[in-house]
Amino acid sequence: VLVMEKNLNYRIATTLKEYLEKNEGIKVILTRNSDYDLSLSNRIKYAVDNNADYFISVHVNSRSTDEVDSHGCMVLMSCSRYQPSNAKVASVYDSEMRMAKSIISKLNVLGLPIANDWNTENTGILQRVTTVGETYPDGSPADYYTLLYCGTKAGLPSIIVEHAFLSNEGDYRNFLSTNEKLDALAKADAEAIIESIR
């Protein structure tokens, strides 16, 4: 059976939207409502143009076939404390960190451990600096990941949630193999997001 990451991501994202919008004052705008591709920088632009307060990118992780032991969850966030003047929050970095910690905690409660093979210092939070020497306007090193770089420059707290490894049989079976399991991930995300912004 061929399982495509984009389909799992879409199920988690649409269910997350449903859970979040049960809370008064929360409106969720998806960057895709069907099977089409929007560039990473245009996703942030779309969010900014729609006056978003946060950008959450929903993913399922994967490794090559010779690295099937990789398992667990992590959240990617900015490595920089750069704070553009147009930011809606007092600290983009602190907002991302608060949300990332909350999501990791809720996913851990589901039984999904912190990713075992990434440089997350056992926190489940990954921050990666660009490899080409690019910087933010304040001179701090820019982020490696386009979504995080564009989000930070736009003053929009942005994170990437990697829920589990599609390439790991145990992660797939325990967390990704049914709609009910995907919905549980979305519910954990929703609880964490609400907790971190209230």
Regions from the PLM with identified roles:
Residues V3-R198:
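Active-site-proximal helix/loop segments of hydrolytic enzymes
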